[in-house]
Amino acid sequence: MNRPVKAGILVFCLLPLTASPAQNLPPRRSFEIATGPVAGTYFPMGELIARVVSHPPGLARCEKSAQCGPPGVIVSAKTSDGAVANVLAVNDGSVASGLAQGNVVADAVAGRGAFRKDGRQTHIRVMADLFPESMQLLVSARSPIKSVADLKGKRVSLGNANSGSDVIASEILAAYEVHPRKIVRETYEISGGLLREGKIDAFFFLGGAPNVLIADMVGRGQAKLVPIDGPGRNRLIAKVKGLSADLIPTGAYRGTKRVETISCHTLWIVKDTAPPDAVYDLVRALYHPGNRPMLEQGPSPAQEIKLGETASLLSVPLHPGAAQFYREVGQLPPTPPNPQKKPRK
């Protein structure tokens, strides 16, 4: 299977990129986050997280307080095909970390759904539960399509192949028992162009609302949102763990009233062999109060990255370094004592 992320940098590359012994600075070390297509939510969010937690030698805000990641670590965001591809790349060690929806990660750990062919992805561990994503169904502004049921016999893009949008949109069509005439799997940018040109009738977009691409299309009168609601949504939520009823609020896009839909949570995942102390430092930096202004000023849904979502992490394994941090801040219960371990004399 083709990997969407460039291989060659394993989890926490410990070889120094530059060394400054005269200045007594730590060596630079690289750490990647596999994200998704540029027009989606994952790439800008990956770039923001990278800025928040990176700790290049000599950066003033990192030296003044413990609000950055491990000294010398430079975090970067990499584009990819999306969630499924990110999970596979993290599991096999061809990328350090990645973003993926919680339901996709749960499928990977269990070896079901999109991972039935590749089998259980046993090396995946979770660093953080980051933010919710809303499924947004776009059709032409002049289209008669008013519901998911109206997609029957139409031309529909599900998003990038092997992306979270592809996985969840497929589940939506199944739950509503809808069979489009043609299914397309293209990036959001291409899907938007195809909709403008009348070459498809609708496309699914999974990400934070508002999104720049959708705001532009809605604002120009080229597209409108269609609700995902009713009995079909109820069947979908009952079938797919990790999905919940949600809505896009009034005013999220110009002239748009509230739109019923579904949402899921995005996780930051890493391989199980990542050093616990390094993962601890990265997670601590992400939630450090000193970094809160950077998240508040970031693109939607960066504002949703906050402590308090760790309950949803329990369906998939936490990385030990992350678990240690959550225990220390009271988000997880303390580690119970081992009754078979003899106390030191």
What does each of the following model-derived ranges do?
Residues 24-101:
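N-terminal (or domain-start) structured segment
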Residues 30-65, 129, 133-197, 292, ...:
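Bilobed "Venus flytrap"/periplasmic-binding protein-like clamshell domains
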Residues 59-60, 175-183, 192, 236-237, ...:
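Secondary-structure end/capping motifs
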Residues 8-16:
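Bacterial N-terminal signal peptides
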Residues 1-9:
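Bacterial N-terminal signal peptides that target proteins for export
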Residues 21-34, 68, 145-155, 320, ...:
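Immediate post-signal peptide segment of exported/extracytoplasmic ligand-binding proteins
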Residues 102-104, 112-114, 143, 179-274:
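Pocket-lining segment of extracytoplasmic ligand-binding domains
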